[in-house]
C-alpha cells in the first residue's frame, strides 16, 4: 500500500485562565488540550485505531518530546518534514484520557510563535492538526478509511481554518468540546484570519 501524507484536525480546547496566567507571568506560554482522538471516524472520514496512536504517541514522546524537539508549524504544512523557519511551538507532554490524546504545548518566541501567541491573547479560535505518513484501507463496516499499521506521526500544527470544520481551539467558557461542522456565516471571519497569517508568514519568508 502506498504511504502518503495524512493530515487531520481535532478540536483543541484550552482554558482562557491558562492563557491569562501565561501572559501575566511572562514565562513559557503553555496551552493544553486534545491533540488527536482514537477509534472514532473524524470529519475527513478516517479512523485512527487506538493501538496505532498509542504506539506512535509513545515513540513521539521518547524520540521527540524527551529530546525537546517535538516541533510544529503555524498554518497548513504540506511536507513530511518540519520546516524550522516556520516553527511556532513545541509539544512538551502527551498523555491519554480514554480515547483522547491530550497534550501540553509551549508556544515559542519565534516569528511564527509570536503570531500564534498574539492570536491566543486576542481570543482567536485556532485548530490543531496532526501530520503523519502512512496508508489507509477502507473499513466497510464503519464506512471510513482506517489508518494502517505503517502510520508514522510527524508533528502537530496549529491551523486557522482547519480542513475539518469545527476543529478550532477556543476557551472552555465559550463553547463545549465538540468535533463537528461549523454551520455559521462567521466562518468567513476565520478565513480572513488565515489570509492575514499567510500574508505575515510570506513577508517573514521574503
Task: Place the predicted regions along the sequence by residue.
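Polar/acidic, low-complexity leader/linker segments enriched in S/T/G and N/D
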Residues: 1-66, 180-185, 189-194, 199-202
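Residue microenvironments linked to proteolytic maturation
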Residues: 8, 71, 90-189
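A structural signal for short, hydrophobic beta-strand segments that form beta-sheets
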Residues: 9-20, 35, 81-93, 153, ...
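Short, flexible beta-strand-to-coil junctions
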Residues: 35-41, 75-78, 131-137
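A short, polar/proline- and glycine-enriched secondary-structure boundary/capping micro-motif
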Residues: 43-45, 83, 113-117
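Acidic Ser/Thr/Pro-rich low-complexity disordered segments
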Residues: 45-49, 77-85
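Short conserved beta-strand and strand-loop elements enriched in small hydrophobics
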Residues: 62, 66-82, 128
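Intrinsically disordered, low-complexity regulatory segments
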Residues: 205-206
Amino acid at each position: 500500500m502506498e504511504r502518503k501524507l495524512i493530515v487531520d484536525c481535532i478540536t483543541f480546547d484550552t482554558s482562557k485562565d491558562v492563557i491569562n496566567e501565561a501572559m501575566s507571568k511572562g514565562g513559557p506560554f503553555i496551552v493544553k488540550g486534545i491533540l488527536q482522538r482514537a477509534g472514532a471516524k473524524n470529519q475527513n472520514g478516517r479512523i485512527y485505531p487506538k493501538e496505532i496512536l498509542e504506539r506512535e504517541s509513545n515513540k513521539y514522546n521518547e524520540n521527540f518530546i524527551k529530546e525537546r524537539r517535538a516541533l510544529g508549524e503555524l498554518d497548513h504544512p504540506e511536507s513530511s518534514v518540519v520546516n524550522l523557519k516556520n516553527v511556532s511551538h513545541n509539544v512538551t507532554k502527551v498523555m491519554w484520557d480514554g480515547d483522547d490524546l491530550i497534550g501540553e504545548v509551549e508556544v515559542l518566541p519565534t516569528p511564527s510563535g509570536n503570531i500564534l501567541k498574539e492570536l491566543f491573547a486576542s481570543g482567536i479560535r485556532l485548530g490543531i492538526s496532526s501530520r503523519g505518513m502512512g496508508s489507509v484501507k477502507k473499513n466497510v463496516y464503519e464506512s471510513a478509511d482506517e489508518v494502517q499499521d505503517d502510520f508514522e506521526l510527524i508533528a502537530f500544527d496549529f491551523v486557522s481554518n482547519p480542513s475539518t470544520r469545527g476543529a478550532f481551539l477556543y476557551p472552555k467558557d465559550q463553547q463545549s468540546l465538540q468535533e463537528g461542522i461549523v454551520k455559521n456565516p462567521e466562518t468567513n471571519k476565520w478565513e480572513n484570519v488565515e489570509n492575514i497569517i499567510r500574508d505575515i508568514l510570506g513577508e517573514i519568508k521574503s
